[in-house]
Structure formats: C-alpha cells, structure tokens
C-alpha cells in the first residue's frame, strides 16, 4: 500500500489510463476539499506531465451570497496560483422551473454545459472532476436502494467520453479522509457547503449512518466498490453491444420520434438483453435526456406489458412518451395532436409530400418497374381519371380489390392488416378524380392495378410511395 496521497492517485491514474502527457485539462473547482485536492494534485504533476490547467467554476446561485463568495474564493486562488479561471453564475432555480426537473438534475445540466463550452474554448482533452472513493460507494448504494439501470448500478465511471475528449475522475481511488488530510498538509482552507450535511438528502444519510459501519468491516472497502464498478462497466459494455446488435433485428420501423418493434422477436431475446434493448430505445427517443422520474419500475412494467395475452393496450411514460401495443407490434412514440383529415391533389407526373412526411412520386412510362413491391402502384394510364387525390380515410370507404369480386370496406382492410387504430387516421388513401379508391399503400391495390405478369407494351401511370417511417438501426 502506498503511503502518500499523491502516490496512491498516481497508481490509480496509471492503472486506469486516466491521463496522457502534454494535455490541456479543465478542472472543475467548487472550492471544496475534493476539488482543491484534485487541483493541487494536478499542479504537482503539471511539469512532469506537461499539463495546461484551466479552472472552471459554476455558481448555481442556490445559496445567495455564500455561493458567490465561493466563486470569489476560487477566482482569488487561481490568481495567486497564476492559472486561468473561468467562472459563471447560473440561476439554476429558474432553469429548473422552466424545464420542469429537480434541482440536482438542473444543476448538473447547467454545469456540464458550461464545462463543455470551456473545454471547446481551450481545445482541452480532459475535464477533471473531484469525485472520490466514498462518492463511489454512496452512488452505488443509493442506486441499489432506489433502483436503477444496469449501467447505473455500475456507479461512477473513472473515464468516459465527453465532448471531443474525456471526463476523468482521478480521485476515485482515495477516500474523503485522505483528501482532507492532503488539504491539511498543504495548509489549504477549502470552502464548506452546508448542504452536504443536510439529512434530507439520501446521499448525506448514507454518508453519515451507513458508510462508517462499512468502514468498520473493511477500512479499504472503497477499493472493493471501485473494483465492482469497473467489472460492472466492462460487463455492461459487452452486453450493450450484444443488445444493440439484437435490437436492430427486432425493430421494424424507425423515425425521429417513433420506434416500432416485433413483440415475438423481442421476447425471443434473453431477459438481460431485453432490459438493455428497452434502454437503447429510450436513449434514442429521449435523445439521452431520460426524465429523472423514469426508473427501473417503468422497465419492469413494460416487460410485463409485452407478456400480456390481450392483443392491444398502452402505457404512458414520463415526458409524454406513449407505448402502444397492437397485436404483435409495439410502438414507442411521443403523444401527438389528433390528426386532422387531409386531402391533396397529385398530378401525373408529379411529387407531393404530406404533412406527416409521407411522399408520393408519379410518372408515366411504357415500361413497368422491375421492383413491383407494396410501395408501387401501376395502372394503364387511360383507365384512370386525373388528377389523383391523396386523402385520409372516410366513414364508409370501400374499394374493389385486385383479384376479387365486389368491394371491401377500408376499415376491414385495416383490421385484417392489424394496423393500430391510432395509425389509421393518418394512413393515406389514393383516389382518382371521380373519387374511386385505387390504392391503399402497403396494404391493397384496386382492380385497376396491373401486375407484372399482366403487363404488355402500353402507357402506364406509376405511383411510388415512401413512408416517413423506415426500418433501420437505432443509434447507440
């Protein structure tokens, strides 16, 4: 065991490949003992590692004059040390109210946005923060007590991608006690945030009542928690890659704000991959800003939702995310306003894009397309009256079906195809100038349609349809 604080941090930094030589580092300094210990450690290594150091401080304006005095303290210290200091005052309470989030999440968003800006300004490779071994223990315990994702249970990462570089935490290998001793040896007078002692916060209660007992059992227990954290992160990285690969085979449709998946294909995955697959979808749709009110309880409810025997149903998630099951498909999408009836003329040849993003392209040709799939409609040009009209469905709509006698209700076509009710109102119907329905894209062609086998040399009207939804890969 190393005797000195600096040697212990050196070993930890080397073991986890935390810091490269000849780098610019933005150091988050609150003025408290943790961040001061981090700053002075980096200053001690500055010449040896050829480091450029920039200090960044955020006044969240939670504590009025007291927090402003913290800012002035950091500014004065940096002036004495001759290092660059970037500070900002942010009314986090106002930001919190504006975006409807809790104070801690709001403060974190504001703080990280500022750190990213300073990192970019100085072309820094790293942002360094002062989290230590006790913080790691508290974080893991708190997430185990409250519930979290597998990634969350792994605790605080030593090093992770951030902006164009990395966010690093070199002090995770040392305890709070060791940090305080280091500050005392350097005769530092750190600022103390009184909120760190308020027992209304779970973390503070764990710090006061739980950690002392754990340290009695094993004074080096923070090292065990850190080892657990690293192993969990390594396992999680592998499982995430596997889940990503599997989910891209399960997803049937994808757009910016919606994802649909095949329930049977999803349920064929192992439970660990199902949980991570759901997390991938949520990260994609929420754009990695998952509401703090969303927890593992929601994931459990969703998995149970998939197992239900009822063919339809829905769940509401935080942030207006709605999950709708329809037969063997489940869609994740943000709540939308009721779709208004629509109707647009389509010239031949011509192109239109509907308000929902669906696109129709028409052409006239003596040859029919080689790819006659469900997105293409072909009819003899002279059999159709023009202009065409693209509209939403109407009560009582019927059409003649290619290869069948009589007519069939559009409603029945939707039901047979298991089209979810909420999608039927925006599903386009193609009519000719007389109002006769000639095509329901992706579902049924009318008796006017020409198949590839029937085609002879003639003048044809061809419609190509492209839905706003696409099958595709989810982003990591």
From Swiss-Prot:
GO molecular function: ATP binding; tRNA(Ile)-lysidine synthase activity
InterPro entries reported for this sequence: Lysidine-tRNA-synth_C, Rossmann-like_a/b/a_fold, TilS/TtcA_N, tRNA_Ile_lys_synt, tRNA_Ile_lys_synt_N, tRNA_Ile_lys_synt_subst-bd
Any Gene Ontology CC annotation: cytoplasm
Gene Ontology terms: biological process: tRNA modification
Statement: the UniProt record of this protein carries the keyword Membrane: no
Keywords for the protein's UniProt record, in alphabetical order: ATP-binding, Cytoplasm, Ligase, Nucleotide-binding, tRNA processing
Primary localisation category: cytoplasm
Reaction(s) this enzyme catalyzes, per UniProt: cytidine(34) in tRNA(Ile2) + L-lysine + ATP = lysidine(34) in tRNA(Ile2) + AMP + diphosphate + H(+)
Enzyme class: ligase
EC code: 6.3.4.19
Compartments in which it is found: Cytoplasm
Binding-site residues for ATP, renumbered to this chain: 30-35
Domain notes: The N-terminal region contains the highly conserved SGGXDS motif, predicted to be a P-loop motif involved in ATP binding.
NCBIfam families per the UniProt record, alphabetical: lysidine_TilS_C, lysidine_TilS_N
Family designation: Belongs to the tRNA(Ile)-lysidine synthase family.
Function: Ligates lysine onto the cytidine present at position 34 of the AUA codon-specific tRNA(Ile) that contains the anticodon CAU, in an ATP-dependent manner. Cytidine is converted to lysidine, thus changing the amino acid specificity of the tRNA from methionine to isoleucine.
Protein name as it appears in the record: tRNA(Ile)-lysidine synthase
Organism: Bacillus cereus (strain ATCC 14579 / DSM 31 / CCUG 7414 / JCM 2152 / NBRC 15305 / NCIMB 9373 / NCTC 2599 / NRRL B-3711)
